[in-house]
Design a protein with these regions (language model features):
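Structural signature of tandem alpha-helical TPR/SEL1-like repeats
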Residues: 49-61, 82-95, 117-129, 151-163, ...
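Surface-exposed, polar helix/loop patches in the mature regions of secreted/periplasmic/lumenal proteins
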Residues: 93-149
Length: 290
């Protein structure tokens, strides 16, 4: 499962607005706040420069200087989450909520971190709180959809993804996961529409190409399926499933030499990824292609 992460630039634009609002709110200005805010802004610049560890240090120092400065905790959480440090990130988002109880984005990202840490029940509570505070927050609706999909509440997931699309129509991950649920529910035409929308938004969306190819393959449309699997592999050269699926198409077409070539690529990738089961499955298919 892929938990949604805003692109860094979008996060930064939101956070800069939040920081600006804090700077002009007299009730939030203390003797410590100006240097703390300076550190937050310094941290944001470091993130833009790709200096994540230095940014974390700046955000942490800002939070230490002014524990009530919510953007310091929030940015610290985002940076820690980029390093896949889920528990420290969740702790930072929680501190942001304590500092600013109406901070919907902090609730949404805390929910996302908890979901990524395999704690869907707590995640759902924080995501619902985010939506209560800010009903048009696409991030929260999207992650709530992921929770519902994990709970196999398929119609609930579709409803959450659809709402997320209403508020964040340009985010390809939402369309992709909507397509996944539609495909699981055998609503194939809706799945195709969703995957194509994801690809339109992000042409190199490997998983969307792959799922579209899988649908084409199941429908017996071998050439369109092969084209989709090729696009998936071009978008992500380490996508072993795309090579394996292309091998299945070549086998069905009777092009065994081509099948062996891509299946060997798939086997090598599965071995590199230490996926012994699929390495063995691919080896069996290779034997059939000889």
């Amino acid at each position: 499962m892929t938990v949604f992460r805003f692109k860094q630039q979008l996060y930064l634009s939101i956070l800069l607005l939040i920081c600006a609002q804090l700077l002009v709110t007299p009730s939030r200005i203390t003797a410590q706040t100006p240097p703390a805010v300076d550190l937050v802004n310094q941290g944001l610049q470091l993130v833009q420069q790709g200096k994540l560890q230095q940014a974390i240090a700046a955000f942490a120092k800002a939070a230490s200087l002014d524990p009530k400065l919510a953007p310091a905790h929030y940015n610290l959480g985002l940076a820690l989450r980029q390093q896949e440090k889920l528990q420290p990130a969740a702790d930072a988002f929680y501190q942001a909520i304590l500092a600013e109880p109406q901070f919907a984005l902090a609730y949404a990202n805390l929910g996302a971190a908890l979901l990524e840490g395999n704690n869907p029940q707590q995640a759902q509570a924080y995501l619902q709180k985010a939506i209560e505070l800010e009903p048009n927050l696409g991030l929260a609706h999207y992650n709530l959809g992921l929770v519902k999909a994990q709970q196999q509440d398929w119609q609930g997931a579709i409803a959450s993804y659809t709402t997320a699309l209403k508020y964040s129509p340009d985010l390809p991950e939402i369309s992709y996961h909507l397509g996944v649920v539609y495909r699981q529910q055998n609503e194939i035409e809706q799945a195709i529409i969703a995957f194509r929308r994801a690809i339109q938004l992000l042409p190199n969306y490997a998983e969307a190409h792959y799922n579209l190819g899988a649908i084409m393959f199941a429908q017996g449309q071998l050439q369109p399926a092969l084209a989709a699997f090729r696009q998936a592999a071009q978008a992500n050269s380490n996508y072993a499933n795309a090579y394996y699926a292309a091998g299945l198409v070549f086998m069905r077409l009777g092009q065994h030499q081509e099948a062996r070539r891509v299946l060997q690529d798939a086997k090598n990738l599965y071995a590199k990824q230490r996926n012994a089961q699929w390495e063995a499955n691919t080896d069996q298919l290779l034997q059939q292609a000889r």
